[in-house]
Amino acid sequence: MRFIHALLLAGIAHSAYASEKLTFKTDLEKLEREKAAQIGVAIVDPQGEIVAGHRMAQRFAMCSTFKFPLAALVFERIDSGTERGDRKLSYGPDMIVEWSPATERFLASGHMTVLEAAQAAVQLSDNGATNLLLREIGGPAAMTQYFRKIGDSVSRLDRKEPEMGDNTPGDLRDTTTPIAMARTVAKVLYGGALTSTSTHTIERWLIGNQTGDATLRAGFPKDWVVGEKTGTCANGGRNDIGFFKAQERDYAVAVYTTAPKLSAVERDELVASVGQVITQLILSTDK
């Protein structure tokens, strides 16, 4: 009798979980219709196992979300001894491109350290600092090689900033899929890709990101620990990737959206709405 009772409870739990995942899907489809948007979402656990998703295998432009794995590559080089965080990277005015606040601030000195550039790329989405790091690691091809090294066979970087943000429909360059990027996040933060010191630093940077207050974290409960890296590009691209801790469980998440008919503020609100849909799913399945 106890065995039958346990089976009944398991069946009820499975049915409830399936119902919540269906609600998750229908809520995202409703957002897509209302906003004339395409929304890609992947949520995985620390092992990279799928929790939920929508358009998980569809390619989207990475936009600036690649700056998080770029920073991870920089930390890997530091961990292995092939790079030093305090090494000064010299540059001139030619490194100043659109949206380079930290690069402009350090221009008078003629250099930034490796860690200063990496932090600016993650927390400010500084394009000049990003290109400076790409110069040092060997260009976009080296970034793609790192993706492959950590098990991501999908994500690719082909150009530097700002060209990589063109987001031309049908162009495979500089793209990823939600599931590929979510698993890359999980690999970096939970899979031992970096030393504990480097992992802690990059987590702290993501939590202190200055470009994402209106996106995913705006849709998550205030008591969740959230760290993320946003991305914005042409033709309505607005993205957010990172991690969150909810009810003592860790998750990696990737959200990619294309909404060319919306304003910049409305695109932020769209990503925040996706965060609310994710919240509903997590709270209902973690009971």
Curated annotation (Swiss-Prot):
Keywords: Antibiotic resistance, Disulfide bond, Hydrolase, Plasmid, Signal. It comes from the Bacteria. Inhibited by the beta-lactamase-blocking agents clavulanic acid, tazobactam, sulbactam and tazobactam and the carbapenem, imipenem. Inhibition by imipenem may involve Gly-165. GO terms for molecular function: beta-lactamase activity. The active site is at S64 (nucleophile). It catalyses: a beta-lactam + H2O = a substituted beta-amino acid. GO terms for biological process: beta-lactam antibiotic catabolic process; response to antibiotic. Belongs to the class-A beta-lactamase family. Monomer. May form dimers. Extended-spectrum beta-lactamase (ESBL) which confers resistance to penicillins, as well as first, second, third and fourth-generation cephalosporins. Has ceftazidime-hydrolyzing activity. Inactive against the carbapenems, imipenem, meropenem, ertapenem and doripenem. However, weak hydrolytic activity with respect to imipenem has also been reported. This is Beta-lactamase GES-1. The gene is ges-1.
